[in-house]
Each structure stands twice: as structure tokens, then as C-alpha cells.
UniProtKB/Swiss-Prot annotation:
Organism expressing this protein natively: Mus musculus
Residue ranges of the TM segments: 446-466
Protein name per Swiss-Prot or TrEMBL: Serine/threonine-protein kinase/endoribonuclease IRE1
A Pfam cross-reference name: Ribonuc_2-5A
Organ and tissue specificity: Expressed in liver (at protein level). Ubiquitously expressed. High levels in thymus, liver and lung. In the brain, preferentially expressed in cortical, hippocampal and olfactory neurons.
Domain of life: Eukaryota
SUPFAM superfamilies in UniProt: Protein kinase-like (PK-like), Quinoprotein alcohol dehydrogenase-like
Modifications made to the protein after synthesis: Autophosphorylated following homodimerization. Autophosphorylation promotes activation of the endoribonuclease domain. In response to ER stress, phosphorylated at Ser-724, Ser-729 and possibly Ser-726; phosphorylation promotes oligomerization and endoribonuclease activity. Dephosphorylated at Ser-724, Ser-729 and possibly Ser-726 by RPAP2 to abort failed ER-stress adaptation and trigger apoptosis. Phosphorylated at Ser-724; in response to the ER stressor tunicamycin. ADP-ribosylated by PARP16 upon ER stress, which increases both kinase and endonuclease activities.
GO CC field: AIP1-IRE1 complex; endoplasmic reticulum membrane; IRE1-RACK1-PP2A complex; IRE1-TRAF2-ASK1 complex; mitochondrion; nuclear inner membrane
Essential cofactor(s): Mg(2+)
The keyword Cell division is assigned to this record: no
Glycosylated residue positions: N178
Biased composition annotated in UniProt, kind: Low complexity: 513-551
Amino acid sequence: MPARWLLLLLALLLPPPGPGSFGRTSTVTLPETLLFVSTLDGSLHAVSKRTGSIKWTLKEDPVLQVPTHVEEPAFLPDPNDGSLYTLGGKNNEGLTKLPFTIPELVQASPCRSSDGILYMGKKQDIWYVIDLLTGEKQQTLSSAFADSLCPSTSLLYLGRTEYTITMYDTKTRELRWNATYFDYAASLPEDDVDYKMSHFVSNGDGLVVTVDSESGDVLWIQNYASPVVAFYVWQGEVLRKVVHINVAVETLRYLTFMSGEVGRITKWKYPFPKETEAKSKLTPTLYVGKYSTSLYASPSMVHEGVAVVPRGSTLPLLEGPQTDGVTIGDKGECVITPSTDLKFDPGLKGKSKLNYLRNYWLLIGHHETPLSASTKMLERFPNNLPKHRENVIPADSEKRSFEEVINIVGQTSDNTPTTVSQDVEEKLARAPAKPEAPVDSMLKDMATIILSTFLLVGWVAFIITYPLSVHQQRQLQHQQFQKELEKIQLLQQQQLPFHPHGDLTQDPEFLDSSGPFSESSGTSSPSPSPRASNHSLHPSSSASRAGTSPSLEQDDEDEETRMVIVGKISFCPKDVLGHGAEGTIVYKGMFDNRDVAVKRILPECFSFADREVQLLRESDEHPNVIRYFCTEKDRQFQYIAIELCAATLQEYVEQKDFAHLGLEPITLLHQTTSGLAHLHSLNIVHRDLKPHNILLSMPNAHGRIKAMISDFGLCKKLAVGRHSFSRRSGVPGTEGWIAPEMLSEDCKDNPTYTVDIFSAGCVFYYVISEGNHPFGKSLQRQANILLGACNLDCFHSDKHEDVIARELIEKMIAMDPQQRPSAKHVLKHPFFWSLEKQLQFFQDVSDRIEKEALDGPIVRQLERGGRAVVKMDWRENITVPLQTDLRKFRTYKGGSVRDLLRAMRNKKHHYRELPVEVQETLGSIPDDFVRYFTSRFPHLLSHTYQAMELCRHERLFQTYYWHEPTEPQPPVIPYAL
């Protein structure tokens, strides 16, 4: 139980609040002990310390207010204490922590930087007089005014301070950046052995877990809908801060062993799963989150398995980090604490800073704790203000960038601190003794203007005349090239060596741009020497300086052993991986010292290859879509380098001795569907999904493999706003895997994305049945598809897993395309749920319908056909110890699905209080417990899931159902009181 001990250790290390924190005031008697929770949206919740339930809420302005219209975000503020982080300096060194906060900047203002930026700060205090019983604001006290106050004995005085920092550019006369930070007046935390609670807060949302500091038990869990920034208790006459720990939401769920909807009191009623020692250690990070339309930063603790951006990294590439391994549950569902091994781009590598700033939202996530910057506070006042030597920073010789608005400087070579006055003396000594005369300055400006005018006129003339001469030269070269090309074709027929004309070989730009000789795209860069051919055979003698083509074969060499090199792609012709349609051959090759698969495509298919490459570029950032590297061309072929894979899905299923390497069938299907959902989100229809086009990757560093969708040759990119495509260009796909609407003459509507869902349904059955097809043998498949004659005999109606799989596959291969679910619907289906999630779903359903009327729409839907689900009387189908225990407390109806779910929920909640024989018959929670019921009532999960679709829009059930963004909201079914 390392996770539980770790949480207890963290709770003990928290500095607890001072004495008198439980309900003591000098003039007001608290009706109950309160805890005050401040959230990022400006709310102050008065909550019960015992349960965390909200008694009342005071709503004010958000804790942070930063501009949203600036092109580049200058700083990331911390809502916990007003700390500031920069997004990088001159060298894009990533996030950097500044050694001062917004309140400290306000304290130091007014000040001015050397590049003309004025800093202005404002601090405004305000007092709120609050009715302690209702939370109503009775009076507001500020320096401007004070309302009248009615006398009361239960009043609470809360002070709040507003810090505003503004930066103004004197050159552009525009506001550069500003921020407002609010904080409640409170004393600092103190040691208090009587305070027995520790608070853990998740980053990015309002989840709070309060733990008993001594036992480590979870006292209560609440979600306050906005990130929590501070906790306070009432001591004497003022608030006093209580220390809390910010934790990643994945880590918090891991530590408390929770999943699904939170918001109820939960304690550890069963031990944690066995985890490695390393995974139980928490690491400090910096979490960058988003509130409204702006970013903020906050310290956060994470456990091993949470992806962390390395220190000094800037934004990752758009294709995302490289994933060497992902921990996924046995049933295809990501576990609560996924373990990933991510490799981020170490830097921008020459990418423009503009693109970096436009994509700064990609910073959201956990980063390694940044280094602190060595900075100096600028305190140079404008000329019309009184100057003091210690407050003046002279103009710097270098123009400071926007990221250095607060004058971020490196440490001196001897690592000794330099004071502001010393810096002033050094720079005054280097300053010129006499300013430049105004007349000399005007003469220099006039000379500059005249020279610039002449240069501009000459440049315009060059731009006008140069394209004409270049166009004439290109026409002559093109005519000459056509003549030489005719010679090539004639000499190739006679198998004679060809010597191109000297003028052509002397023009590298012509060779690089003409096309038939060389073309690189994707991640491949042009050849360093444009004169060198991009296609060569090795071993072979080097090309002669006269321009002999090295791609022609030498009579004394074995063709099968030559290494073909085209640009950055190389391969050996004997390493054939497979053959495709239209003469396509796939070789094992190399690209940038990486093993790849090389597709060699004939000229007749160049247009299809270009379309495939374009679609690969758009979609390959997903881990379950084949990765594309580059494209090269020579005179005869086009070559596409893609990710090298170990096998196809067909080999995975049909070869009995195939090493699965931990990739279970349901996990494989989940990954395939995830890749398909990604394609559909990009308006791409695959149109040829089959086992042969689903590839399995090479094992990663952890020995794991994953499924990837490949072969984009028949893909269709739909225009924006379109959801269907025409059949006029033919019927794409492979016989036996084509949806019926593609071939049916009776179908008047154009096909849609659902053709892929049909093919995926066939693939699902193929994997689960270990090689069978829902529409029979290969010769009759397509005919059976048109007739709708499917056969799912491998599924048994008395087996829970088969019932769930059959229900999903029947929807996916439905004859009516509109009845098929989307890929995102499929991913939400119980087919992929873990046993833990199944149990949580049953519990949430029981909670939802507990007080619903028997004649209400939800209960009626749940009980419709329910007697068959519970086998007429579920009480007669459970073991005797459980029957005996159920009779002790309440009466259950044996023919009611609702009562069966209620019994499951009650026994799960009171599992530790059950007799030993009942615990033994139910088994451990959650796996054995949920199997106990689903094995006896195999249709229970499927029936309940379909019945509760009425509530799919409710927040409680959004984890279990998917609804399209454009789907109309159904009428709200209110909770029964």
C-alpha cells in the first residue's frame, strides 16, 4: 500500500495551522466549524470542515485578470501567491521563474525600463462585512465609500486586496501588458498539532481531497468547479491561511484510488493495487493551465507516469511528442494512472518565434520545475519626476526584447551580486561626455534618406527587369531539356549510356526545379549539392564530371545486392516486404539512420501517391495512424518512406504462434478505433479498412507494440461542411469489407463516414472470433453483405462479454448507415470498459434513480424488459450467504432491476462490514465483485447502459456516453427530491 503511506507522509509533512483554528472567534460564535476555500473564478466558499459541503459562497472578481488581446503572452502568473513566470528569454530557454511577485512589483512601482516602458502599480484594499449564517454581503468598506450597516451579532469581516500592474510603451504610446491579482488579507500559516486535516488540490479543476493527517484516510472529496488557490480558517478576528498541496489530477486519483464521478464521501475500503516504489514517489513540477482565455502557472506534485515537459524545452512540434510506451488496461481502456514515456523536442531548432507565440496554448501541461532568473528591479523614473541615484538605471547599450521587460539578466562572471548603484557608476563611466549636436544629427538623417531613395529605385528596376530575362532563359532551357529527354528515351530502349548536355548539368537551379530529376517533400531537405543526382546505386563507381547518370545499371554488378539511394531514402531491392496494387512494391529501407518501409510507386499512380502523402501529413500526429517521413522521386518511380511495422492484424489473428507482447485483442481494437476517430475528426474517410491495412508497430523500449491504421491510397478528404462523398468515381475498398450502401443501387444517399464503421465492425468480429467474418466465407461475403445476412454465432447469450460485444458489433454492421454509431460513440461503449468502470457505472446509476418515482421516465425505461434481465427473480440466482445477508436490513423486489442495482451499491458501500462468508462469496473489489453479478446476469450492463441513455447529457454520465456537439439537448429530467 505505498500510495496510501505516501499520502499519509505528505499529510504529516504539511505545516498545520495555528491554535484556535476550529471555530474560535472573539465576537462571533460560529454555528459550526468552517473552512474557507478560495477559487480562481473569484468565489470564496464557506464549507464544512467535516464534510466539505458548501454553506454559502461569496462571488467576487476572478483572482487573476490578464489581457487576452496581446499577440504574445508576456508572463504566466501564479494565482496562489502572484508569482510570475516568463515564457522564455532571448534563447527560448523555456519557462523561467522570476524572483518577485505581482504584489512586490506593485510595491516597487513606479519604475521605468531603458527601452521606454513605464511600470505603474496600484494597490486597493476593501473590506466585506458578511453575514456568517447566510453569506450575504452586509457592507462594503473602502477608501471611497462605506455603506450603512445594520447591527448584527454574527458578522464576519473579510479583507481583500487588489494589486494591479500596468506596463506602458512610451514609443508606441500603447498599453503593453497588465495584470490584476486579488488576495484575501490573512495571516501566514502556523504550526498547530490540533489541526488534523491536510488538503490536496488537483490542478486544472476544483477537485479537493481532504485527508486525516494521522491515519491517512480520506475524510471528504469535493469539486468546487474552479481551481482552488487558497484555504483559510478563522482565528481570532482574521483569516489565517492553511497550507495545501497542488497535485496533478491523475496523481490525486491515484493516491485516493478513485475513478468516475467524484463528489461523495469516500474512504479507503480496500487496499491500493500493487505499485512499484518508483511510481509512489512524487516529483515537484510546474503546471501550466488555462482559465477563460488566458494561461496561469502553479506548482504541482506528480507521480511517475504523468507526462512532464523537460526543463528548458519550448513548445513541442505539432505532431506531438514521440511515445515509446503507453500503459493501457487489458480491455482496451486507459487505466487511471497511464504510464507514458514521452520525448519532447529539445527546442525550436530554428523555427520562427512567431509560430512559437501563436501556438503558446500548447504549453498547457506539467513542466519540470523551472530555474529562477537572476533579475534586477528597474526603478528609473521619468525625467519630470525627482531622481535619486539608487533608483536610476541608465540606458543600456542593447535594446531589450519584450521577454526581458523586467530586465532579466544573467549572473556576472565572478558570481558576485551587482547593486543598482554600482551598475549606474559603471555605465556612467562608459557614457559619452557630450551629447551629439542637433544639427549634425539632422545632416546624418538627410544623407540616410537620400541614400535609401537611390537604393529603393534601383531595387524596383531590378525586380521589374529580372523576371523577364529569367523567363526567357527558362524557355530556352526547357526546349533544350525536351530534346535531351527524347534522347534519354531512345538510348534507354537501346540500353546505351547517356551523357546529358553540358549546359544542363551546369545549371543546378534548373535540375532542382524541373521536377523529373529530383523532388523532395515532407521532412526531407534538398540535397546539399544540387548537381549531385538524388538517385544512385551502390556499390558503383561515382558519376563522372561530365554528368553520367549514376542511376543506370553497371553490367558487372548484381542488381539484387545494390543499395538504391534516392535523396534521404535508401533500400536494397532484395528486401521486399510486400506487394500492393498497381505494381506498388514495399521495401525495407532507411531514412536518416532510421529503419522505415519504402513504398515504390509507378508513374501511373503518382497522382494517387501525392494525395496519399497529403493525407498522411495531415493525420500522422496520432499514435495509432502510420507515421509518414518523406517523399522522393527519380525518373522512374516515386518513393514514400513510412514507419516500419512488425506485422499486420491478419498475422496477429491467424498465426497461432504470434507474440502479442502484451497487446490484448480489446486493446488493439481500442487503438484502431482511436486512430479511425482521429481520421474522421480531420474529415478523412479511409474507405479500405481491413485486417491487412491495420499494422502492428515494432516493439518500443518497453517491449510493447501498438496498432496503427495504414494505406491511405483510397482515402477521401471531405470538404469543410460535407459529410458524404460521391460514388461516381467508382467503388473503393476490398471485396468482403465494403459497406452495403457502396454497392446497393437502391441507396439514393451518398456514402458517409459510416462506411468505415461498417468495415471496423467486421474487423471487430474478425479479431474476437479469431479469424471469422460476420458475413461468411470470402466468396460469399459481399453478396451476404448486400443481403444483410450476417452470422454472429461465436457469441453466446449467457456470457457477459459476448453480450456486450454482440450489441456493439450489430450496431456497427447495421444495414442502415444512420443506425451505426460514430467512432467516438464506439470508444465510449462498455465493450472497452474496465471492471472498475463497470462497477462505478452501476453505482452511479443506482445513486441517480434512488429517489426517482416508480412511474418516472427513467425508472420505467430501466424496468422495461427487466424481468428477463434479472431472470424473473434475481434473489434466487445469487448465493445463499448473500441472500441471507440481504434479508437482514430491507426488502428487495426480485423482479426489479432497480432493486438489484441498489443491492449491489449497498453491499459495495458496506463491504468491510459484511460477514466473512459474504465477502468470500462476493470476492475482492472491484474485479471479483462486479464479475459476481455480471456472470449471473449477463444482460445487466447492456440493458442498463441502453436504458440510461435518457440521462447521457447529465454531467454524471458524460464519462460513459458520447453525444455530438450539434446534437440537440433533450429536456432536462429533474432529480426527484
